[in-house]
Amino acid sequence: VMVVCPLGVKQEFVVKDGPRLGMNYRYVGCDADADKALAETPFLITNYERIRDGQLSERWIQANISGICLDEGAILGNLVTKTQQTFTDILSEIPYRWVATATPAPNDYRQLIYFADFLGDGDAGLSLTKWFGRNPDKAGDLQLMPHMEREFWLWVSSWALFVNKPSDLGFDDKGFE
């Protein structure tokens, strides 16, 4: 299993969250690092640039990783970025994919479309034309069509999970406030 996150976030997994959950994460920056780390733990962590720029190769990832979590998934927020295209190409064959984000960009539901595209739950181009229309007040902007809103949220609820607080998952909210 590999977590992919911004470089500044990796220590949260390695030092804090991983040990608390009984997971021994190892940071990897290239195929050789990953081979060594897999001898010690099944929990790997890297940053987006290592995959995007090829230090962790497509061949290695597809041969060794069965589950991947993109932390701070807003990195997928645009169809024309090198990161989004690379991740879709390289990681689409990983059987278990998960995208985590504190929140999609405020009022930009298109990010949910990009997440679904990465997860294999919908083609971003088709989804954008199905549920979104041009904003007549702002050039180049799309907005969720009001008559499609219910259908859009039903579709999102078929593949997404929204968690607001620990009790949403059956845990105590004490200390969360």
Language-model features: locations:
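Residues immediately flanking
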Residues: L7, Y48, E72
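Conserved P-loop NTPase motor "coupling/switch" region that bridges the ATPase
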Residues: V15, R20-N24, A39-E40, G67-I68, ...
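Short secondary-structure boundary/capping segments
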Residues: V1, A34-A37, R59, T88-I90, ...
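Conserved helix/coil segment N-terminal to the catalytic DExD/H
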Residues: A32-G67, N78, K82
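Alpha-helix capping/helix-boundary segments
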Residues: V9-K10, R50-I51, P104-A105
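Conserved strand-helix element at the start of the C-terminal RecA-like helicase core
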Residues: V3, L7, L169-G175
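Conserved nucleic-acid-binding Ia/Ib motif block in the N-terminal RecA-like helicase ATPase lobe
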Residues: M2-F43
